[in-house]
């Protein structure tokens, strides 16, 4: 096992512990709390994959951070902070929409790279809106926190979330997963739109019809889906 992988995990565990103390003292806002919960799941997955105990890793991580801070001068710290790009946290969903439990009548789950896609295949002939909470850096989507599909009535019918055991994903991973989710929902004659905020920072533009541009691979896949559906309908007639 690579030593840098282990030390990175140990430091992440300790920093999560520090952030948890901030929340316990009621000093964190809603996005801060949201990231804390998501990162907790990620750390558990990484700990299981690496075979490391989180409590023990936290103690070692504390020692690493204390050693670095002891060696770090105030001037160097100021320069580091000034040169680091700042990311923004954007929210399509409210805290209630983000934390609400939901259930699927006909569940389907698919893993697309480091992202997990869940769809309720029982949903038909609905208008569906995709909303997401994510961070942005340099005006581009950086990290997806959670994406959910909502009907006009407010029911959750689909979701895309990062896999805790596979931390880290690219903007292309997110766009591919959205394409899969759209295809799955449209299979049952649902009309799917993507929020303007998500379109802007994932694709760099927004369409009035709420549809992001699809990649050639996604277009071919959706064309095959349409042809298959037409053949199925003809056989039914």
UniProtKB/Swiss-Prot annotation:
InterPro entries, sorted:
NS1 (IPR004208), NS1A (IPR000256), NS1A_effect_dom-like_sf (IPR038064), uS15_NS1_RNA-bd_sf (IPR009068)
Subunit: Homodimer. Interacts with host TRIM25 (via coiled coil); this interaction specifically inhibits TRIM25 multimerization and TRIM25-mediated RIGI CARD ubiquitination. Interacts with human EIF2AK2/PKR, CPSF4, IVNS1ABP and PABPN1.
Taken from the UniProt entry, a GO cellular component term is: host cell nucleus
Name of this chain's protein: Non-structural protein 1
Its principal location? host cell
Keyword RNA-binding in record? yes
Please report a single Pfam family linked to this protein: Flu_NS1
**The species this protein was found in:** Influenza A virus (strain A/Aichi/2/1968 H3N2)
What ranges does the record give for the region PABPN1-binding, renumbered to this chain? 223-230
**Record's subcellular location:** Host nucleus; Host cytoplasm
What's in the keyword line of the UniProt record? Eukaryotic host gene expression shutoff by virus, Host cytoplasm, Host gene expression shutoff by virus, Host mRNA suppression by virus, Host nucleus, Host-virus interaction, Inhibition of host innate immune response by virus, Inhibition of host interferon signaling pathway by virus, Inhibition of host PKR by virus, Inhibition of host pre-mRNA processing by virus, Inhibition of host RIG-I by virus, Inhibition of host RLR pathway by virus, Interferon antiviral system evasion, RNA-binding, Ubl conjugation, Viral immunoevasion
Gene behind the chain: NS
How is the polypeptide modified once translated?
Upon interferon induction, ISGylated via host HERC5; this results in the impairment of NS1 interaction with RNA targets due to its inability to form homodimers and to interact with host EIF2AK2/PKR.
Residue segments, region Disordered = 205-237
């Amino acid at each position: 096992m690579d030593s840098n992988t282990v030390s990175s995990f140990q430091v992440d565990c300790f920093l999560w512990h520090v952030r948890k103390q901030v929340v316990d003292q009621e000093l964190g806002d809603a996005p801060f709390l949201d990231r804390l919960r998501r990162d907790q799941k990620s750390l558990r997955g990484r700990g299981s994959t690496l075979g490391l105990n989180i409590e023990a890793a936290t103690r070692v991580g504390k020692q690493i951070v204390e050693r670095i801070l002891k060696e770090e001068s105030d001037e160097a710290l100021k320069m580091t902070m000034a040169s680091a790009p700042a990311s923004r946290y954007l929210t399509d969903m409210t805290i209630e929409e983000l934390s609400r439990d939901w259930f699927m009548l006909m569940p389907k789950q698919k893993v697309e790279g480091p992202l997990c896609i869940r769809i309720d295949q029982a949903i038909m002939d609905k208008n569906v809106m995709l909303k997401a909470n994510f961070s942005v850096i340099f005006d581009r989507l950086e990290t997806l926190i959670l994406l959910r599909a909502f009907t006009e009535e407010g029911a959750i019918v689909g979701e895309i979330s990062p896999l805790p055991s596979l931390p880290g994903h690219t903007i292309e991973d997110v766009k591919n997963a959205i394409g899969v989710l759209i295809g799955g929902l449209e299979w049952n004659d649902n009309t799917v739109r993507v929020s303007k905020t998500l379109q802007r920072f994932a694709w760099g533009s927004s369409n009035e019809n709420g549809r992001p541009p699809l990649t050639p691979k996604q277009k071919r896949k959706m064309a095959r889906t349409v042809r298959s559906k037409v053949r199925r309908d003809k056989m039914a007639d």
